[in-house]
Amino acid sequence: VIAQMVALIVTVTPSIRNLPRFIFMMAGPLVTGLAFTIWLLFASRLRWQEKLALVIAGIAFPLIASQISDFDDALRTTMWIYGVPLAELMITLALSIWSQAPRRCLLAVLLLGLGWSSFALVRNEGFDGDYYAEFRWRWSPRHEDRLPELTPQSGVTPETSENADAPVNDLLWSQYRGPEGNGSSNEEIPPLDWSKNPPKELWRISIGPGWGSFSYNNQKLFTQEQRSEKEHITCYAAVDGSVIWTHADTTRFNEVVSGAGPRSTPSVVNGHVYALGGTGLLTCLNEVDGTVVWQKNLVSEFGAPIPMWGFSGSPLILEDKLIIFAGGPEKNGLLALECAAGNTLWGFPSTDMNYTTARPMTLCGQSVVVFCDGKGAHAIDPNDGSAVWTFKPELWKGPAMVDPQQIGPDSLIVGLGDGVGTARLEVSKTDDQWTVTEAWSSTKLRPSFNDCVVFDNGVYGFNQAIFSCIDATTGERKWQGGRYGFGQAMLLKKAGQILVAAENGDVVLLKATPEKLTELSRLPMLNDKTWNHPIVADNRLFLRNGKTAVCLQLVE
């Protein structure tokens, strides 16, 4: 029992890396359950009739609980994680309270029954970043059941459809993580003072589950969401949040930790919307009305397995190419497809689980696409998919969770794995020979799935659940202290400020300085688990999670 309690404590200790915590969470009940059963049967002083009764009860009550509970994968996992140690505790408690047979056995059976039947009262909607279960009363309505139909309200109007084929404004947010792919807004927004001029809420709507962000173009917002068995790519009017159009496919991705819904963010370029669903449907739509131009299934057409947490990388549009991770065999790993028709142009081998988006960079004067997988960081020639260089930092562990990010003419930072750390790479080229060196590796910034931003020689991001800043030159910690859970951040470059979407749904405004943590304001906003990246476009902050989307005007 003590060993099981230790395993549970390790599971929810944020300072420990996610993989060991996950192993303790799943293996702890198995190891301690077997040890407890062996002790009960062979080392305890119970009568054989009591041992038999407890074994029967220990098998029967979980089976009964599974029949009377709202028994899905999330609750099944919860019953394993919490039910086994609860059963051990109930038996130990009964034997400690009553030493006489058969009363001690009757009490143990009674407590076992009460413990296991309690799972019939709740359901589990997933886990947060610290692996705390999100329990809800079983009878409380599910969010998806309360969602209205996605019916176009505003239609296609001149305001929303004009200039759909015009070049995308490079100040706006037409692809995942913004115009430069680094979570930074270049808009002329002055420093914000929410104590004197708080943001004005323009609209708020209910939205389906999904962990992707918004993209923005021509006064329209594009995102992905789940509605029952339909996975939607939806276009909303930025002015009021009304539905302009939606495209639905009959597919549903769902997993225990984060629940249902797609994970990717659409890209909007040259009048088309490109989106990747959680089960691997890659779709090109007309930006104006949402009609299908082409669609590919990464699983059936490229032999790609669905990753544990679903397909999560967003389409990168580079001139006439769409670059996306599939993870299929041979050269069906990272793919380049024609934007116009979806035909395959090239492939780069990569079969590891991957949850990142490839990034275009210019290093040593050469245009490359940088992509991370279990083998390290790769620079790839976007013209033919050939490897320019590959480098694996010393602390590297897969799978890749956060995007690589260029921070200098010949330097970039990469995440080292889920909760492992961050490294800075320096790249040089002599004639045709490339050299990649590791300037530093830091365990002072250990992101899970949370991307960082860079400003004033500081790298700002999540050291697990604590917002932190490290020196971009040395990797040394500058400060740590923002308790924002496993959230996401973006940079208002002109204002020198950072907007953090905290995991609990709060919006936090920080001064972007490596000197110290300076929290300027914190506003409750979404009031639920929020893993989605915030975006800023046309003086408005757009934020969503798996239940709600909201629009805030930043400056009057």
Predicted segments — roles?
Residues N218-Q219, N270-G271, E319-D320, G365-S367, ...:
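Short coil/turn segments that connect the beta-strands within blades of beta-propeller domains
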Residues V420, G505, N527-E556:
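Blade-level signature of beta-propeller repeat domains, shared across WD40, Kelch, NHL, RCC1
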Residues V420-T422, S442-A512:
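Loop/turn-rich, solvent-exposed surfaces of beta-rich toroidal or solenoidal domains
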Residues V6-S99:
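Membrane-embedded alpha-helical segments of integral membrane proteins
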Residues A237-D240, N286-D289, E338-A341, D381-G385, ...:
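Short loop/turn segments that connect beta-strands within beta-propeller blades
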Residues K196, L202-S215, K230, T246-S267, ...:
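Extracytoplasmic beta-rich repeat domains
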Residues Q100-G126:
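Internal/C-terminal transmembrane anchor helices
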Residues R138-S206, H232-T234, V239-E255, T291-A304, ...:
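Aromatic (tryptophan-biased) beta-strands that constitute blades/sheets of beta-rich domains
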